[in-house]
Design a protein with these regions (language model features):
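Surface-exposed loop/interface segments of Gram-negative outer-membrane beta-barrel transport/assembly proteins
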Residues: 1, 22-29, 33-115, 131-238
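Long hydrophobic segments that form regular secondary structure
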Residues: 3, 121-126, 243
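Outer-membrane beta-barrel channels and translocator barrels
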Residues: 6-7, 43-47, 123-125, 180-182, ...
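Transmembrane beta-strand segments of Gram-negative outer membrane beta-barrel proteins
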Residues: 8-15
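Short, flexible loop/turn motifs enriched in small residues
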Residues: 9, 233-238, 245-249
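Transmembrane beta-strand segments that form the barrel wall of outer-membrane beta-barrel proteins
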Residues: 15-21, 253-261
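Exposed, low-structure sequence patches enriched in small/polar residues
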Residues: 242-246, 253-256
């Protein structure tokens, strides 16, 4: 991390790297992240604050089924020596061999994430300020999966590619006033806020692969194929007005109005 600045501007930049093997075979997790914070007094009447962070994550492999692992016979023959197909437990479990499920599959999940936030504070007049805040979130998450027919006798090979994109925008404008005149104290707020989110999803999958060497690539290699996609959007606008009046502390009056749409 690096930080510094002076009286009118300050900054912080940091990064992190994580790359580790998981406790199960053929699985690991990696993450690379960066973050930057900047605060500045641009003018006597204007302050700025910015926060930006980004991360890339990769998960290789899938989680094991511990119920199957703990109940499978520890001394059984792991797989057929002639075909290379993993055997099922003839005594304790009917499910597929948990070791074979990990060894004969390939799963990769990714996430590319960006978060950004900025606040502008305008000191318009004595007691009167305007805060303008904007935020943006972005996440792209593709994933890929492959399972071999060698997982178990009679198993069908399969593959899938999936991807989702999430975006969110938000803007908040807050005009506030506060002052005291003799025994009278007045404060008022007017807030206007807008937000919108969009999510898209796409997926293709196939089973009965003619050539397992390509793994989760080339859906045309599958005997049976399917695809799907979806789109979701939502938005919200809100307005709030609030007035507070205080006379000599014991007497207090407040009124508020809010509308959403």
């Amino acid at each position: 991390a690096v930080s510094g600045g002076g009286k009118s501007a300050r900054y912080l930049i940091s990064g992190n790297v994580l790359d580790q093997q998981a406790v199960t075979i053929l699985s690991k997790y990696s993450r690379y992240g960066i973050r930057a914070n900047i605060d500045a007094d641009v003018r006597r009447w204007l302050q700025l604050s910015t926060k930006i962070s980004g991360a890339i994550m990769h998960q290789d492999g899938s989680a094991p089924n511990w119920h199957h692992i703990l109940n499978y016979s520890p001394t059984m023959e792991l797989k057929d020596p002639e075909t290379g197909v993993y055997n099922k437990d003839p005594y304790n479990m009917l499910s597929n061999n948990p070791y074979g499920a990990l060894a004969e599959s390939d799963n990769d999940s990714y996430s590319y994430n960006l978060n950004a936030n900025m606040v502008l504070r305008f000191n318009i007049y004595d007691g009167l300020t305007l805060n303008v805040q904007g935020g943006y979130n972005f996440d792209y998450a593709p994933s890929y999966a492959f399972s071999s027919s060698k997982v178990a006798s009679g198993a069908t090979s399969s593959m899938s590619n999936k991807a989702s994109v999430y975006q969110y925008w938000q803007n908040t404008n807050n005009l506030s006033y506060a002052n005291t005149f003799n025994r009278h104290s007045i404060s008022a707020n007017a807030v206007w806020e807008m937000s919108k989110s969009v999510t898209t999803n796409m997926s293709i999958s196939g089973s009965g692969l003619n050539n397992e060497s390509v793994g989760y690539w080339d859906v045309s290699n599958a005997t049976v194929r399917s695809e799907s996609n979806s789109y979701t959007q939502s938005s919200l606008m809100s307005g709030i007005v609030r007035l507070n009046y205080d006379y000599d502390k014991p007497y207090f009056f407040t009124a508020a109005l809010r509308a959403d749409g």
